Swiss-Prot record:
It is found in: Plastid, Chloroplast thylakoid membrane. One of its GO terms (molecular function) is electron transporter, transferring electrons within cytochrome b6/f complex of photosystem II activity. The chain crosses the membrane at residues 4-24. It is a single-pass membrane protein. This is Cytochrome b6-f complex subunit 6. Component of the cytochrome b6-f complex, which mediates electron transfer between photosystem II (PSII) and photosystem I (PSI), cyclic electron flow around PSI, and state transitions. PetL is important for photoautotrophic growth as well as for electron transfer efficiency and stability of the cytochrome b6-f complex. Belongs to the PetL family. One of its GO terms (biological process) is photosynthesis.
């Protein structure tokens, strides 16, 4: 089903963006 695939892709993208933001915030706090 394309709906499940697109939903999984959107979830994966959101997770990647969230983790990237968290890593960026932690790096800024470390400096």
């Amino acid at each position: 089903m394309p709906t499940i695939t697109s939903y999984f892709g959107f979830l994966l993208a959101a997770l990647t963006i969230t983790s990237a933001l968290l890593i960026g915030l932690s790096k800024i706090r470390l400096i």
